[in-house]
Amino acid sequence: MNERTSDAFDALLVLSFGGPEGHEEVRPFLENVTRGRGIPPERLDDVAVHYHHFGGISPINALNREIIANVEKELASRNRELPVYFGNRNWKPFGNEAAEQMADDGVKNALVLATSAWGGYSGCQQYQEDIRGMIKHLESQGQSVTFTKLRQFYDHPRFVSTMAQLVQDSYAKLPDELRDEARLVFTAHSIPLAADNAAGTPQDGSLYSSQVKEASALIAKAVGVSDFDVVWQSRSGSPHTPWLEPDIVDHAVELNEKGQKALVVCPVGFISDHMEVIWDLDSELMEEAEKRNMVVERVATVGPTDEFAALVVDLIEEAELKRVIERLGKLPARGSSINGAPCSEGCCGTAKHQTARVNPNARSAAPAAN
């Protein structure tokens, strides 16, 4: 075992949601996602259809490995030596397994990148819970690693500028006669209103949806668009529970009925093209658009880009300097703390305001992959 005694950060853990990588993994993955939530087995069968449609493979693990490869390349370009590990909440490689490997390798003081730009329970606090679980697991093995989670990065200049370029790329793909009239629509994962109200500190108020709206405004401004929409997708809770609205497909239908012929849809809430992007947008939204002879250009996500890797290394350097360097927004960008501690007093409340993410009445019932 390597002996590392320095207080400097000596590793990065990319911590994500996880997803199956074969037909035989779909059902146990879904059982992990919904454990303790009382979801009927037949609902899991319904949701599994989405994954089996794509060969039983969620793209999220491969996309995260691509992010890791890009981060390693960016670290090397800055003459940095920092090993990068990969762990998930719901599927292999599990966070506990990654933490064990890190401890075995002699890691003492690791940074954690959660694959979410946002505040709130699902986007931030649940990753803090994952970190606490990893620490508890290591303690049961007689091992120890200190984990420091990186902050929320929804308004980092590289995030905004790269998303703006990707939006412009989508506009360029539209037919000439539709480009000027195309409507720009930003979309992010819907959550229950109670969860949004609890996001951030009591003083923040609805931090998650506010961050999504601010990021969208920053990107639109960079593109040169003054009028745009922010909508939501992937709702999967009880139909009796209020969630963030409107839904992207419902909104597209409404716009079309008012005469809109073209949309540029930017999945600002998602780092990579995982299941909810390729199902809810590339399948369901596109099918509805085709029925209506509506042209929709879906904007690429930021995760696979070199600029996103540079953003991650920027965040690492911020953590080393113990101060935030680059921000464009005015809202809080919380989320950084040690060993899963609350990042701010009262942040995200004490209750888990999320509901089970498999719903028989939802348009899309695929589990979330933040």
UniProtKB/Swiss-Prot annotation:
GO molecular function: ferrochelatase activity; metal ion binding
Coiled coil: none
GO cellular component terms, semicolon-separated: cytoplasm
Pathway: Porphyrin-containing compound metabolism; protoheme biosynthesis
Catalytic activity: Fe-coproporphyrin III + 2 H(+) = coproporphyrin III + Fe(2+)
Amino-acid positions noted as binding Fe(2+) in the UniProt annotation, renumbered to this chain: 189, 276
One GO-annotated biological process of the protein: heme biosynthetic process
Keywords of this entry: Cytoplasm, Heme biosynthesis, Iron, Lyase, Metal-binding, Porphyrin biosynthesis
Residues bound to Fe-coproporphyrin III: 58, 127
EC code(s) of this entry: 4.99.1.9
Database matches in InterPro entries: Ferrochelatase, Ferrochelatase_C, Ferrochelatase_N
Record flagged with keyword Iron: yes
Subcellular location: Cytoplasm
Class of this enzyme: lyase
Nucleotide-binding keyword on record: no
Organism superkingdom: Bacteria
NCBIfam families: hemH, PRK00035.2-1
Family: Belongs to the ferrochelatase family.
Role this protein plays: Involved in coproporphyrin-dependent heme b biosynthesis. Catalyzes the insertion of ferrous iron into coproporphyrin III to form Fe-coproporphyrin III.
Protein's recorded name: Coproporphyrin III ferrochelatase
